[in-house]
Amino acid sequence: MAGFPLFHRNPDVSDELYDDHILDHFESPYHKGHLDCPTCSHSDRNPICGDQVTLELLVSDHHVVTEAYFHGKGCAISQAAASILCETIEGKSLAELRDFQAQQMLELLKVRLTASRQKCALLSFKVLKTMLYSLDQPALPCSDVEPTPAPTLAE
């Protein structure tokens, strides 16, 4: 993709959308990449615009996020939001993250967004919430489950 800029300003969009805070996180993202051995990982995409985000977390035995990384592709808003989210959630407990709300995520971006751009901004938040939900579900033990006997026909 040589010759293509990493970021293209749409002349039809207000400069307010491309606030320095967003541009800084888009051009120099925090923890963009992969963890060697994440505790949990989840991916999602926005089918309308094609944004994709994978979030990888390293969670301590005390249920605290010690490292958060992301990777993906998409618009400046979705990728900057993922960077901001990773920076924000490190050091937070899973309980604190369960209480983290979408409005708080939007406030971290420091720009006003249209409804369609909010979907881009909240993609990584959605990935985080889905991951937290899956962590709350009890795991099914693989080796302790006895197979269910096949039904027999009564004679």
Regions found by a protein language model. Name each.
Residues 38, 55, 77-79, 96:
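Basic, gly/Ser/Thr/Pro-rich low-complexity segments located predominantly at protein N termini
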Residues 2-36, 41-42, 66, 92-96, ...:
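C-terminal binding/interaction regions
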Residues 59, 68-75:
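A short interface-forming secondary-structure element
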Residues 77-85, 122-126:
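Short amphipathic alpha-helical face segments that pack within enzyme cores
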Residues 74, 87-94:
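Flexible, glycine-rich terminal cap/loop adjacent to redox cofactors
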Residues 49, 72-80:
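Short, thiol/selenol-centered motifs that function as redox-active sites or metal-ligating centers
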Residues 24, 56, 86:
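A cross-family signal for key residues in well-ordered alpha-helices
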Residues 46, 51-61:
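Short beta-strand elements
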